[in-house]
Amino acid sequence: MTHLKSSMENKESIIGIIGLGYVGLPLVIRFFEEGFKVVGFDVDDKKVDMLNAGESYIKHIKQEKIKSALQGFRATTNFSEIENVNVILICVPTPLTEGNEPDLSYVQSTLKTIQPHLKENQLLILESTTYPGTTEEEIVPVVQNAGFKVGENFFVGYSPEREDPGNPKFSTQTIPKVVSGYSEKCLELTNALYGQIIEKTVPVSSLRVAEM
């Protein structure tokens, strides 16, 4: 854990961001702006090709920012590359079902895809909007079934996305960020990570509090 924390503070950690939409792409830009190397993952070939060509498909994210980010960022559809990153942020959609519950199918599919490629001492954070209990019920078992002990040799956090797309008054950098972790160590790492790119983090006592 100490090595992971220092590598984040020294901008040596490689950040993997899964889901390159209106939540994931601004995070790509912020981590790049602060000096991190970033790998973006998406199942959409067209999005990946556009980003690697320096093109933006999100109205409020200017093309110049994408072109500039290519100095330290690339996008891929190859999820086996998860084993090459230190931090994994899951930013996939969780649209509401007819019963007004978040549909977790994209999260579940992502976890199934990346499970074989997880490695020791990674930090995995869910950003997708969801209901209390999701991180413990969906993410922790996947990590444990891959052979890791959460809080000891693999770390899990939750930080709800707080994007306000296109609002010039608020940006990824300035909107306060709620952060939580499965354990004290997990919270410490999650807070240290976002502290690199967000002006104000708000650590809370548990995953469920952050998910509310």
Where do the language-model regions lie?
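Alpha-helix C-terminal capping/helix-to-coil transition sites in glycosyltransferase folds
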Residues: E83-N84, E120, T174
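Glycine-rich, N-terminal phosphate-binding loop of Rossmann-like dinucleotide-binding domains
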Residues: I90-V92, S128, Y182
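N-terminal Rossmann-fold NAD(P) dinucleotide-binding loop
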Residues: G24-L25
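Internal alpha-helical scaffold of NAD(P)-dependent oxidoreductase catalytic cores
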Residues: P141-G157, E163, P168-M212
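Conserved N-terminal Rossmann-fold NAD(P) cofactor-binding segment
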Residues: T2-I14, E33, K37-V39, V43-V87, ...
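Rossmann-like NAD(P)(H) cofactor-binding subdomain of soluble oxidoreductases
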Residues: L96-R162
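Glycine-rich Rossmann-fold phosphate-binding loop(s) that bind the pyrophosphate
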Residues: L20-G21
